[in-house]
Amino acid sequence: MARQTFVDPLRVAAVGFSSGAWVTLSVAETNAFELFVPPSNLRFRAAAAFYPPCKQAVGRPGIPTLIFIGALDDWTPAAECTNKIASWGNDGPPVELIVYPGAYHGFYYAYLQPGRTMFDHWLEYNGEAADNADHRLHQFLDRHLN
């Protein structure tokens, strides 16, 4: 990606959803696991994770990080993110958690309307949460990439 002529390697953010959000949190760590270390000519400046499995996150992010999660998410519970962020303390770049009341896992995806069960977990689109998350994601990226 960093070799592409249309990519400014100094203005790249990691954004992921669910399991991809775990990868996002992993690349955001100061001492990222070798598998997730970007090439030397690419440095992530910010990270945004939608409904990540926060319980699996290890180190505190070393870049500004924004986490979106639904209060009713039974796959990646919001409480796990709240607890993980509290355990990291306040030293370092900001880590912000946005919890959407009434929202489930997958709230960002319109194709999850109507909602459905997958692997014993409820997934459902929530237009209000998705619109707000989209707006806040753009604000976050503008703030940290420009």
Language-model features, listed with the residues they occupy:
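Primarily recognizes the serine-hydrolase "nucleophile elbow" in alpha/beta-hydrolase
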Residues: M1-G62
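Hydrophobic anchor at the start of a short beta-strand
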Residues: V12, T65, V95
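Stable alpha-helical elements in mature extracytoplasmic
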Residues: S19, E80-K84, A133, L137
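Extracytoplasmic/secreted cell-surface and envelope-processing proteins
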Residues: A57-G59, W75-A78
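Short alpha-helix in the alpha/beta-hydrolase fold that links the catalytic acid
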Residues: I63, P77-W88
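Short beta-strand/loop motif that positions the catalytic acidic residue
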Residues: I67-I69
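Acidic catalytic loop of the alpha/beta-hydrolase fold
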Residues: L72-P77, H105
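C-terminal catalytic histidine-bearing segment of alpha/beta-hydrolase fold enzymes
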Residues: P94-N146
